[in-house]
Amino acid sequence: MWRLTRKIGTRIHISNQLSPIFNKAIGTVPVFRFYSSSPEQKYRKKLLEEAQKQGFNSIEELKNHLKETIESKKREFNKIDPLKELEDYQQKTQMENNNSKHLMTKSRSPLDPSAPKVPFKTLDSFLDVGKLKDLSKQEVEFLWRARWAQKDNTLCAVIPVSVYDKMMANARNNPIFVLPLPRQVQSEDAKPNEEQGMELHYIQWQFVGPQTTHCMMTSLAEYKLHQEFARPHTTLQFHSDLVKDKGIVFMNGHVEPDTNVNVQDAQLLLLNVQRFYGAMGEETPVAKQRVQLLRDFSKASPGFTVEKLISLSQSMEN
């Protein structure tokens, strides 16, 4: 962690054709004779012709090929829809807390698709990179933190390149994820802060430039409502311009003021971004489980569940 200064079985009717042959004779016990021949034995010549037609030298090669195809289909059928899983969870939570009031993230109007695109900001937009190269690592870090110290609704960090590389390797392979954020639940019978609910947030990475990467956070409810035009409540920018010279990466983030996501909420989401994307390593059992859950989500594997996501996000173990 760096220090902050703000996605069936076929019923196989096996009829072994074990139709017993009754040789009935007066005064004798029926003898059951079972006849069973596998398709391969019965149609070996046809199977061999089919195998050769498909470019295989033997029936065994054909069987191995079909086995791989069948296993691939089974994996496809077993895939889950992660967003459907999340939707089911939200509906379940809503029903359980039907009489409760959640302090959920406010939904906003979608982005205007016709609006001109604003060029993304690079490190040079904030500091003169040319001049930074002549300064020591400590001086550069001080300048970066000072640049954001007096600004509201901001986050900033200086990240060791080794930590950044671990996180980016997972981000490039898994650019989309979801993370839970604890939310206060206030019911008619419960005092404020007595109960907690969970609100899910959509995490998306964008590699906008050779040395600039964005991580955007949007409530899942808003993403489902507006899709690609949903407004992120928090945007993190990573600048890797000084990796070779100083061995560090700068991060700055902005939390939109017109939502009820505050800087502390964004910090908690950022902490779990680091943990699930492997920034803290994958040495411990819990750390391995987090990164594996991220990969399960990307692969739409049944291994991903919202319950496991919440449990691992709340665990104090790293």
From Swiss-Prot:
UniProt KW Manganese keyword: no
Modified residues (Phosphoserine): S109
GO BP: mitochondrial proton-transporting ATP synthase complex assembly; mitochondrion organization
Main localization of the protein described in the UniProt heading: mitochondrion
Any Pfam family matching the protein: ATP11
Keywords: Mitochondrion, Phosphoprotein, Transit peptide
Presence of the UniProt keyword DNA damage in the record: no
InterPro entries: ATP11
Protein family (similarity comment): Belongs to the ATP11 family.
Note: Present with 2840 molecules/cell in log phase SD medium.
Role: Essential for the assembly of the mitochondrial F1-F0 complex. May interact with the alpha and/or beta subunits of F1-ATPase.
Identification of the protein by name: Protein ATP11, mitochondrial
